[in-house]
């Protein structure tokens, strides 16, 4: 078995957040004996955007993947603590496919399936049998329209998605994720490989999604985090250094590591620690 749980269950009372939609509770995890995250506790409010920030290797992407159980099959993966979705441990879901319907994920680079544009949008809808077949086209049109891609593809729904531009492929993947009506949307640097125009379009759309979803985004782009998120969190060396309202974290951080990072001076964790 690739995934091993260490220690007992943890209680949600350790998380300082009012009825979060999702929460990590004393989460520690690692691979092959190396600790990657250490005692992380934080809540993600419903209908809000939370940005996860930190230098490369800080643990933020591993944390995001854990929220979707993407690390389960990685050799040597061990964890203790818990992650709660609506108060229920995500590790107690036997049907991982259903869990991932509720917690969708968009990756750094587009990953369309090797099937038609239409079939890409409907892949999850078919797998979960969400609507009758006669409603398939309506679902596809609604989601493609929502992400601003319908006009560009409506006359070539049977085409390969690999004929689309990189930005269009990412929008297609977003439409596919939203087609199964997730409650939480995880985004792993979704605009890092895109042009400024498509980036702006996706950022605006992310903000609109917060009206109905819990959105959690990993980003190295400080300006992006400031623009789109309601809350932000900073990771350093596997630790959650600070989290709170985005404006507060940028304008009056509580920790020296945070101050250095938002000022663009980070990169050496040891140097940041000397400033404490």
From Swiss-Prot:
Ordered alphabetically, the record's keywords are: ATP-binding, Cell membrane, Membrane, Nucleotide-binding, Phosphate transport, Translocase, Transport
Name the Pfam families for this protein.
Answer: ABC_tran (PF00005)
Q: Where is the ABC transporter domain?
A: 22-262
PROSITE patterns, A to Z: ABC_TRANSPORTER_1, ABC_TRANSPORTER_2, PSTB
- Keyword set includes Membrane: yes
Q: Which domain of life is it from?
A: Bacteria
Could you name the Gene Ontology cellular component terms for this entry?
plasma membrane
Function as written in the Swiss-Prot or TrEMBL entry: Part of the ABC transporter complex PstSACB involved in phosphate import. Responsible for energy coupling to the transport system.
Please give the NCBIfam families that the UniProt record associates with this protein: 3a0107s01c2, PRK14271.1
Protein name according to UniProt: Phosphate import ATP-binding protein PstB 2
């Amino acid at each position: 078995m690739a995934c091993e749980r260490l220690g007992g269950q943890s209680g949600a009372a350790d998380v300082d957040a009012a009825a979060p939609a999702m929460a990590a509770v004393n989460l520690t995890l690692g691979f092959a004996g190396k600790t990657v995250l250490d005692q992380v506790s934080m809540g993600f409010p419903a209908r809000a955007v939370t940005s996860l920030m930190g230098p490369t290797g800080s643990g933020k992407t591993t944390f995001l993947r854990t929220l979707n159980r993407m690390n389960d099959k990685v050799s040597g993966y061990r964890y203790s603590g818990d992650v709660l979705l609506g108060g229920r441990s995500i590790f107690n879901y036997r049907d991982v496919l259903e869990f991932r319907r509720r917690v969708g994920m968009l990756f750094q680079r587009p990953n369309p399936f090797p099937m038609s544009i239409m079939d890409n949008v409907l892949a999850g809808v078919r797998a979960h049998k969400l609507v009758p077949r006669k409603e398939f086209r309506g679902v596809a049109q609604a989601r493609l329209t929502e992400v601003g891609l319908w006009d560009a593809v409506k006359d070539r729904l049977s085409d390969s998605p690999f004929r689309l531009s990189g930005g269009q492929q990412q929008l297609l993947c977003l439409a596919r994720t939203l087609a199964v009506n997730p409650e939480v949307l995880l985004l792993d640097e979704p605009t890092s490989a895109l042009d400024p125009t498509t980036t702006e379009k996706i950022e605006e759309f992310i903000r609109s999604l917060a009206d109905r979803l819990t959105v959690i985004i990993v980003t190295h782009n400080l300006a992006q985090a400031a623009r789109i998120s309601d809350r932000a969190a900073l990771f350093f060396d596997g630790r959650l250094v600070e989290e709170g309202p985005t404006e507060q974290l940028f304008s009056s951080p509580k920790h020296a590591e945070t101050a250095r990072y938002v000022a663009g001076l980070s990169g050496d964790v040891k140097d940041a620690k000397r400033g404490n």
